Amino acid sequence: LYSLHIMILPALIIVLIGVHLMMVIIHKHTHYSGPGRTDDNVVGYPLMPVYVAKAGGFFFLVFGVVAAIAATFTINPIWNYGPYDPSPVSAGTQPDWYIGWLDGALRLAPSGWDISIFGYVIPMGVMVPLIVSLLFLALVAAYPFIENWVTKDKREHHVLDRPRNAPTRTAIGAAGVTFYAVLWAGASTDLIATNFQMSLNQVLVAMQIMLLVGPGIAYFVTKRACIALQNKDREVVL
């Protein structure tokens, strides 16, 4: 894992950055709709010198902030902690922000789902959240191809749509964000229960219900809001 962390993953990141830049060169930038902007052109400032100056300025700004933090702050002073002892760890410890939704999936999975096959116990309380999480990530990655297949639209698009002008796509995105947000909040069910003096079981049940009905409600409300905004724009134009 150490060699993977310090060599392979950084190399993959560098390769992916190169692939990203090649895709930008091939497919060009997307841009907002406006006069003279189509799917076949790129309107804006050239790479040299405007964007190079911006990127260089941002780089040195971030570099300066990181250098200042490194020179003035003590981060993770392990020499003050002493030998590792897991016993003092508090019960309110929370997962890192990027892994919280997976922790929430484990917490919100109903217990008692274990299945025994040929003497081997399969912990469905772990397998179901794992499968659901992988399916969610797969759907997010596959959505552009699914929409392309459903709409039969094979053209390249480089002009950005306003969310209201693509109500179904926007509603699906809102449903996905709601699904992720409920799982992410589910990682803190214990803190929610203690801070609001509620029963942990009640919080878990409420989160489970929100996980099932929340995306549907978000889809319906978002789509109706987009259609209403479209009608409002039409009234203004007419």
Q: Model segments located where?
A:
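Membrane-embedded and interfacial regions of multi-pass energy-transducing membrane proteins
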Residues: 1-238
